[in-house]
Amino acid sequence: MSKPSVGINGFGRIGRLVLRAAVEKDSVNVVAVNDPFISIDYMVYLFQYDSTHGRFKGTVAHEGDYLLVAKEGKSQHKIKVYNSRDPAEIQWGSAGADYVVESTGVFTTIEKANAHLKGGAKKVIISAPSADAPMFVVGVNHEKYDHANDHIISNASCTTNCLAPLAKVINDNFGIIEGLMTTVHAVTATQKTVDGPSGKLWRDGRGAGQNIIPASTGAAKAVGKVIPELNGKLTGMAFRVPTPDVSVVDLTARLEKPASLDDIKKVVKAAAEGPLKGVLAYTEDQVVSTDFVSDTHSSIFDAGASIILNPNFVKLISWYDNEFGYSNRVVDLISYIATKA
């Protein structure tokens, strides 16, 4: 089977890292990129140099309106570059892009993302939560994808991708009665470098580098969409903190069946080494956030930081590279749905 051909709309943090993940994994072929705000020579620069994940360990250049991205031992990606503001005008079909990653953060509903299908794409994967597109989390519910009907899908959020695999393992083994999640989350591009206006969410407009900022997140409630048994049982919030990348989920839950911390560690480790290998990881090391920069897992369970009050009330800690781990799952989701074509 030939590799799925992919287009990327929006060459921001996630768009560029999806391309990096695609080059590393060598499982999909990126054939087109669209961004109306970035010239092709600037794309080369932004892709080559990354303050968080380091310099791209390969070659990147441009020839006419094509980006040429290569890495030793991997396939070269010859990528047609478009600069269209209207997604309906992007010629995905003529570039051969069957699967489009919608990573602008703008076209996140079925109606808006549908414009990509007009340009010749067959499937659209939104790299953000969606109000109405079905959400799939690799390792949790990706097998519920329906090729005949699911043309526009969401890869959910980075936080849902961290929380859902852990919640699945705990719920499958011990049952979750209810739970609260907090994510201590790295800054993202929507935040302000210094205090500024921010619509109705006044706290979100405060300086990202100087504050711990309480913020809302739908990530915990979204777990109920990907694990229906947990619908209505989880909610959560976020603290935005002044770090550039890597976040951590704290899941505090009441369990149906009593469990010791060792019981929990055992089932999480078994899942990380078995059915959720590559998605969920397990560590007993004395780690901190920078230890997970560029980690490709969705969720890394921190056995040493997790605690229990009693056998039915637990606090579980799991790390995630909110940029790169998530981008790897976008590529994995495309690889999976392509097998159903």
Curated annotation (Swiss-Prot):
UniProt GO molecular function: glyceraldehyde-3-phosphate dehydrogenase (NAD+) (phosphorylating) activity; NAD binding; NADP binding
Record-annotated active site: C158 (nucleophile)
GO biological process entries: glucose metabolic process; glycolytic process
Domain of life: Eukaryota
Annotated EC: 1.2.1.12
Site features described as Activates thiol group during catalysis, chain residue numbers: H185
Residues annotated as signal peptide: none
Pathway assigned to this chain's UniProt record: Carbohydrate degradation; glycolysis; pyruvate from D-glyceraldehyde 3-phosphate: step 1/5
UniProtKB keywords: Cytoplasm, Glycolysis, NAD, Oxidoreductase
Positions that bind D-glyceraldehyde 3-phosphate: S157, C158, T159, T188, T217, G218, R240
Location in the cell: Cytoplasm
Subunit structure: Homotetramer.
Protein name as annotated: Glyceraldehyde-3-phosphate dehydrogenase 3.1
Organism of origin: Caenorhabditis briggsae
